[in-house]
Amino acid sequence: MVRISVLNDCLNSIVNAERQGKRQVLVRPSSKVIVKFLEVMMKKRYIGEFEIVDDHRSGKIVIDLIGRINKCGVISPRFDVTLDEIEKWASYLLPSRQFGHIVLTTSLGIMDHNEAKTRHTGGKLLGFFY
């Protein structure tokens, strides 16, 4: 089977493990984008700690789940958004105004939409979680 998007595979594994009530999930392969996306999720307390296991191949990530994720996904294609369009995308993708986060990649790094608004920058949409 050919992997189209490793980030999409990772987020699907997390959602499936959450629905089954698992406490941990093993995700492979590892990538910098996945690690940064998980750091945003951990900062917002949607997942617990995660550990990167180097197996001298593509790497693995062991993620501790805390039962807060209802849905997460990748936005493909990665649309360009300006600062003004972030709120439109948030209302389109998230269930309510103060629930959930959109993750974007900007020139300042990977961050959620609230941090992008405070830093006054736009970027490309990566995904969302709530």
From Swiss-Prot:
InterPro entries: Ribosomal_uS8, Ribosomal_uS8_CS, Ribosomal_uS8_sf. Keywords: Ribonucleoprotein, Ribosomal protein. PROSITE patterns: RIBOSOMAL_S8 (PS00053). It comes from Dictyostelium discoideum. NCBIfam families: PRK04034.1 (NF003115). SUPFAM superfamilies: Ribosomal protein S8. Belongs to the universal ribosomal protein uS8 family. GO terms for cellular component: cytosolic small ribosomal subunit; extracellular matrix. PANTHER family: 40S RIBOSOMAL PROTEIN S15A. Gene3D superfamilies: 3.30.1370.30, 3.30.1490.10. GO terms for biological process: translation. It comes from the Eukaryota. This is Small ribosomal subunit protein uS8. The keyword NADP does not apply. GO terms for molecular function: structural constituent of ribosome. The keyword Ligase does not apply.
